[in-house]
């Protein structure tokens, strides 16, 4: 019981920092992981090979800069701040620098696998977040709950139990993977990246509540610190929220449309890496909702 309470207090402080910095809560995990698998299936074999050979790195890349949120989540710091900041900035400078990192690497295939996963994350975020922001405005439902409900929707669609599915099993928080990833970010060491990846697994484990006992402990701790309304949406609910049914259907359409966008962008980025051509203009937007979300019609 004490272990669960301590774990929740860690999450709560970290989540508050996410809310104040980014205006969002911690991101979905299954949706991004599933999206990457779907993009892989439509890519040409010659491009897909690098990702499949280095699947752990591709899978981590699918979570983009979000992995940095989990670095000492309770305390504001430069590492987590870099992750938050990247969501507000245009993405093209990051991907231009990434090309330089790849060009200077001894094992370029590993670097490419990671960054191709990162591209998938960027595309799904930038396609869906404007609509999620509009959903929040219209319904008052939190960002975290909408994304949690979409995770539930996809897990159920895939025949998986949303309550028992462990969402970070594909995250390999190894020193070797951290060594590949660190150079893509500003002034981060491999130890910091590995700590962030381990933090990601720890945070998700703390909020994993397949049974009533753990669920009651987590929700009870939220109520004790008066944060239930803000954070209960981070825990997979026992039943679907009917208010999110239509939102999930819309997000599913956006998701399906984004698969071809991501595959096309991966191929164009590979051309950018290997040939003398311009960085695709699709990178000139943020990971977030952007400035025109209020004009959207749901």
Stretches with model-predicted labels:
Residues 120:
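Aromatic-lined, polymer-binding surfaces characteristic
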Residues 11-115, 123-298:
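N-terminal leader/auxiliary helical segments
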């Amino acid at each position: 019981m004490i272990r669960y309470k301590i774990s929740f207090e860690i999450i709560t402080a970290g989540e508050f920092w996410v809310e104040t910095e980014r205006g969002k809560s911690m991101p979905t995990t299954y949706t991004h992981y599933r999206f990457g698998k779907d993009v892989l299936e439509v890519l040409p074999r010659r491009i897909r090979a690098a990702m499949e050979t280095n699947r752990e790195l591709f899978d981590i890349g699918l979570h983009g800069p979000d992995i940095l949120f989990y670095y000492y989540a309770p305390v504001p710091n430069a590492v987590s701040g870099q992750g938050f900041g990247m969501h507000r900035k245009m993405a093209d400078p990051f991907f231009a620098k990434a090309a330089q990192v790849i060009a200077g690497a001894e094992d370029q295939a590993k670097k490419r696998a990671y960054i191709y996963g990162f591209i998938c994350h960027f595309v799904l975020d930038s396609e869906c977040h404007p609509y999620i922001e509009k959903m929040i405005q219209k319904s008052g439902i939190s960002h975290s709950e909408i994304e949690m409900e979409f995770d539930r929707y996809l897990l159920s669609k895939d025949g998986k139990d949303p309550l028992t599915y462990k969402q970070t099993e594909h995250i390999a928080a190894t020193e070797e993977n951290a060594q590949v990833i660190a150079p893509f970010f500003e002034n981060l060491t491999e130890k910091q990246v590995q700590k962030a990846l381990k933090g990601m697994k720890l945070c998700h484990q703390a909020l994993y509540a397949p049974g009533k006992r753990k669920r009651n402990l987590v929700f009870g701790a939220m109520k004790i610190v008066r944060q239930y309304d803000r954070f209960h949406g981070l825990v997979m609910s026992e039943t679907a929220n009917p208010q999110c049914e239509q939102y999930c259907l819309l997000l599913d359409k956006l998701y399906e449309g984004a698969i071809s966008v991501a595959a096309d962008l991966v191929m164009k980025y590979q051309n950018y890496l290997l040939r003398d051509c311009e960085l695709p203009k699709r990178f000139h937007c943020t990971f977030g909702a952007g400035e025109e979300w209020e004009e959207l019609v749901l």
